[in-house]
């Protein structure tokens, strides 16, 4: 093996990660958190297919930390974890735990923001929410940290067919593989926000041993 190849394989292996949050194995968390997060368990989606829930999470120590940590140049962590009393009690206080795939969602939303050229606002309960959240009836990418409900873009509120369909088209043209809910009132549709998701993505950090 050439020295160039060895260097390429080893480059960065000893670098200190610059992301400030600690990675935790959900199976090692206290019981109250394991019950709420259900790490690694299977959960049926609306079609009856089994989806495996995330096992690895970032530990968020405080709301102050969430207000300061950038997931991308224009999105802070707090924007993805706004929940209310519908979330399970252990997950309404700190420390909080968010699936590691949340960083992938932030990168996609950053690209979407570049495409629309203005601020993108995530709804309360519209970012990450646990499988124990009252909105979580079936497996939803929100519980994987890979879905966001956008209620406003710039000065435009997404509460009409024209607005939702306009920005849905931009999202699909900008983000390969993104899924958006169609406009409407039946289950599986959206009439007051733009739903974007990457599907059921599991993220296992590189330094995880198991």
Report each predicted region and the residues it spans.
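N-terminal secretory targeting signals
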Residues: 1-58, 210
């Amino acid at each position: 093996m050439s020295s160039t190849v060895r260097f390429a394989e080893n480059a960065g292996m000893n670098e200190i990660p610059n992301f400030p949050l600690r990675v935790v194995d959900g199976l090692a968390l206290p019981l109250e958190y394991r019950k709420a997060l259900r790490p690694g368990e299977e959960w049926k989606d609306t079609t009856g297919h089994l989806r495996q829930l995330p096992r690895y999470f970032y530990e968020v120590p405080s709301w102050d930390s969430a207000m300061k940590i950038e997931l991308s140049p224009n999105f802070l962590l707090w924007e993805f974890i706004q929940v209310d009393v519908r979330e399970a009690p252990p997950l309404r206080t700190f420390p909080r735990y968010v699936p590691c795939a949340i960083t992938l969602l932030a990168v996609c939303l950053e690209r979407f923001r570049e495409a629309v050229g203005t601020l993108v606002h995530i709804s309360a309960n519209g970012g990450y929410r646990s499988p124990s959240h009252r909105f979580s009836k079936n497996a939803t990418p929100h519980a994987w940290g890979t879905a966001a409900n956008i209620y406003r873009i710039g000065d435009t509120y997404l509460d009409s067919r024209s607005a939702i369909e306009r920005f849905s088209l931009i999202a699909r043209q900008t983000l390969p593989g993104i899924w958006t809910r169609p406009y409407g009132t039946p289950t599986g549709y959206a009439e007051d926000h733009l739903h974007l998701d990457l599907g059921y993505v599991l993220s296992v950090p590189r330094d995880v041993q198991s």
